Amino acid sequence: RGLGDVYKRQLQIAQQRYEEGEVNSNQTIYYLQLIEQLPTELDLVVIATSSKPRLTILKSLLAKVKVTNIILEKFLFTGLTDYDEAEQLLQINHVNVWVNCPRRLFDFYVEIDSMIDKQKPLVMEYTDSNWGLCCNSIHMIDIFMMLSGEKTYTACFDGIIPQVKDSKRNGYIEFNGTVNVLTPNGSTLRLACVDDDTVQHQMTIINGSHHIIINEPEGFMSVDGNKQPVHIKYQSQLTGAVADEILLNGNCKLTTYFESSNYHKVFLKGILDVYNKVTGEMHDRCPIT
């Protein structure tokens, strides 16, 4: 296994974290800073950078290394043209690619999915305080699309508060307000992010006769009034299982790049329009990650 990072301090921290865990004597891990130090062929690469450098890293990687499978972190890219450029690059190099929106892997969302009548519209709402609307909406859109059984959506950004906020990640921005999502079968998703710490995390899903409430921070859901615990897996508990699935079967349950790319582009176009109106400038990129 190899771990690459341009910042030596981050590599040292990663090594420390790895060695604090239960080390597998059958594994060898390398800590690298340059793509040129990688082997010429790799079975699986996870690109877990922020959004701005991701396409450049992807291009540099595929120019030097034959990669069979890649997992990309969201938010994928900051510019709309990046998505088609990346798609062409991935197709030319015959790479299997997925995007890490891991709620699809949570057992309780799989259970909810089995309850949903896909012939009826789904009504989903998510409200919380300062949860990173720009950064994290794609997670909610992704699980909404899985549950609704839809592949395309439109979105209305009229409810965004026209004030640019600094993201907790340096060099990136955020907005508060609401985004409303609509699919062809009439399913809707309302995403609300407020600057009010008294507002409690709330996710609701209504479909047919089912009324479901999910509270991820407190670890429970209520299905038609019946409350039950849910297990929120950490990323560290998920990555190994996903990697095994990809390496053994050549596939996994994460969203493919080509599907997630479409979800990203609709959201990015909408939030970029808001960003340009608020700043009074014509940016071709919106710095969200």
Stretch-by-stretch model annotation:
Residues 2-7:
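Short, small-residue-biased leader/transition segments that mark boundaries at the very start
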Residues 14-15:
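Conserved SAM-binding loop
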Residues 18-20, 44-49, 245-289:
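C-terminal helix-rich "cap/oligomerization" subdomain common to oxidoreductases
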Residues 27-41:
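Short acidic low-complexity segments
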Residues 37-57:
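Rossmann-like NAD(P)-binding element
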Residues 44, 55-102:
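Beta-strand-loop-alpha-helix segment that lines the small-molecule cofactor/substrate pocket
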Residues 124-198, 258-261:
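Rossmann-like dinucleotide-binding domain that binds NAD(P)(H)
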Residues 169-174, 182-246, 250-258:
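NAD(P)-dinucleotide binding in Rossmann-like oxidoreductases
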